[in-house]
Amino acid sequence: MNILTDPLKLKTSGCADANASKCAEGDGEGSVQVQLDPNVKIGSAKVFSIYGKGGIGKSTTSSNLSVAFSKLGKRVLQIGCDPKHDSTFTLTKRLIPTVIDVLEEVNFHSEELRPEDFVFEGYNGVMCLEAGGPPAGTGCGGYVVGQTVKLLKEHHLLEDTDVVIFDVLGDVVCGGFAAPLQHSERAMIVAANDFDSIFAANRIAAAIQAKSKNYGVRLAGIIANRSRETDQIDKFGAATGIQRVAHLPDLDVIRKSRLKKMTLFEMDHTDEILAVQQEYLRLATEMWEAKTPPVQGKPLKDRDIFDLLGFD
């Protein structure tokens, strides 16, 4: 059975076939909403999506959070949802083939694939997958995400998984790259203590709340990353009710871990590293035990964000 249609052949006028994820009508400018097929849901695993401004450190955060869950004894699957397919390289020490790569090799006949063709074991047993995506300017990345989940279910790879982490492309909040929210119970936003990333976080929060009207996903809060201080993030939180759930400081050793293709849990155990490891373990524990309650906050209008942030 061929469960994935070539994304380059997708049209905005409708789905590729009757079994594909449903597509809403276009908005007149070529945009479509990719909606979850009710028959394709992740099972009993806890599912989290990580969003944030491009380059803010989502992949570093996601990978170290995945390891933290694995250190708690959980079976973890990390799914990279970016055509750059670099979400998992600190876990696997290489750029692994994407789902799109391997499907192209078999002319999109998914029944010819084996699990080891597209799922790879990384550090401390974290299972890694890169969804990939169509070339720039073509197809729909959200469709690829939805069909990746279908492929995982087809091979029964979600049955022995406790935690799934979606690491999602930049600050794109279109219907396509919002697709992981349809599978998630909690979404977190990675932001630094600066205007641009908080501005992006505000827009992402609005997208998450829009999805929460039809799906079970709820915003859990903001992970402050690459930031010595958190005063601007906390000011934003006070104005919106969107709380900060973790603080990961701006340390050179974190940058070096990416260059060494390592997670922070593999680096030399300095006091700095141990403190950051403990912060990841604390956050993973709270996420697992559902101690990160859903945010009932209200994102601000763009002009209000502009007026709010900055020094008096």
Curated annotation (Swiss-Prot):
Which species expresses this protein natively? Rhodopseudomonas palustris (strain HaA2)
Keywords of this entry:
4Fe-4S, ATP-binding, Bacteriochlorophyll biosynthesis, Chlorophyll biosynthesis, Iron, Iron-sulfur, Magnesium, Metal-binding, Nucleotide-binding, Oxidoreductase, Photosynthesis
Q: Identify the CDD domains for this entry.
A: Bchl-like
Please explain the role this protein plays, according to its UniProt record: Component of the dark-operative protochlorophyllide reductase (DPOR) that uses Mg-ATP and reduced ferredoxin to reduce ring D of protochlorophyllide (Pchlide) to form chlorophyllide a (Chlide). This reaction is light-independent. The L component serves as a unique electron donor to the NB-component of the complex, and binds Mg-ATP.
Question: What are the recorded GO MF terms, alphabetically?
Answer: 4 iron, 4 sulfur cluster binding; ATP binding; metal ion binding; oxidoreductase activity, acting on iron-sulfur proteins as donors; oxidoreductase activity, acting on the CH-CH group of donors, iron-sulfur protein as acceptor
Lineage, opening ranks: Bacteria, Pseudomonadati, Pseudomonadota, Alphaproteobacteria, Hyphomicrobiales
Name of the protein in its database record: Light-independent protochlorophyllide reductase iron-sulfur ATP-binding protein
Annotated InterPro entries: NifH/chlL_CS, NifH/frxC, P-loop_NTPase, Protochlorophyllide_ATP-bd
Assembly and binders = Homodimer. Protochlorophyllide reductase is composed of three subunits; BchL, BchN and BchB.
